[in-house]
Amino acid sequence: MRLIKSSIVLFATFILIFSLAACGKSEVQKVRVGEVTHSIFYAPQYVALSEGFFEEEGLEIDLQGTFGGDKTMTALLSDGIDIALVGSETSIYVYAQGATDPVINFAQLTQTDGTFLVSREKVENFSWDQLKGSTFLGQRKGGMPQMVGEFVLNKHGVDPQTDLELIQNIEFANIANAFASGTGDYVQLFEPTASIFEQEGKGHIVASFGKESGHVPYTTFMTKESYIKENKEVVEKFTRAIYKAQKWVETHSAKEVAESIAPYFEDTPIDLIETVVERYKEQGSFATDPILDEEEWNNLQTIMDDAGELPTDVEHGILVNTDIAESVISE
């Protein structure tokens, strides 16, 4: 009789363990994330992946390249992706078009511009007024890089419309190749391209747009309002994983960060990744928490307005949800 009871208890325990395992397995949820471009600038996102922070939260991330703000928004609005990593200006453009299901910024990843000014010739004692009379190969009109670029030029007394020849009709993916082929005296580039050009003697980094522009919600995670309502727990878990990664990046060296994200940049030498990470850490480009505050939001709209690209002024609370980030941080 005792043997039978023991067998029953053992069987029940097995069933319980199996059920819990099955239950845990079913809780893993796939989240499709579209990134506007693939860049070391987004290091905390790759740390969240490589260090298993998303996995700890029961999330499986399907990371997709959407390449361009307009394409990223199209993918999000058409349910091709669940969450977008893109500049906050895109949410304002969508809102201004009368969207019935607005796109909400819920977790900030980068807090400065991520581009650098690269000159074709080596420049001694660089000053911004040296751009006057030059040909400047900028970024796509209406995107954050171009708007920040114009904002910084104006800040230093250089009118991008009259003081230089501004080229901004080249596709994002082709800008670096255009400069390498001989177009422009100066170009605005992301890393690691800027450092690669410097190593190869194709250009020289002379200034940082991130240092000059101040804090701005340059790249944030956003999703449709309806997705947050229907998947609030998923968004909370996602934000928690990002916050863990942000603190990890903040407390680890550039070398350690480079080693963590290297699998996502197989064609980039590890020492170059480290150089780029150090540069971004030094200028405070990586947000240390996911909260997009009102001051940053207003700075964004000032930059958009100065560039003539702000379709309508939008209050912080309309397109920004800080409740989720604040809740995660307070845990």
Where are the regions a protein language model picked out?
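Pocket-lining segment of extracytoplasmic ligand-binding domains
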Residues: 90, 171-265
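Residues within well-ordered alpha helices
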Residues: 47, 53, 152, 196, ...
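Short, low-complexity disordered leader/linker segments with a strong preference
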Residues: 1-30, 328-331
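Short, glycine-/small- and polar/acidic-enriched structural segments
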Residues: 29-161, 165-169, 178, 185-191, ...
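Secondary-structure end/capping motifs
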Residues: 229-311
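Soluble non-cytosolic domains of exported or imported proteins
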Residues: 66-70, 85, 139, 143-144, ...
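Alpha-helical structural context
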Residues: 155-156, 200, 264, 307
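Conserved C-terminal helix/tail region of periplasmic/extracytoplasmic solute-binding proteins
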Residues: 300-331
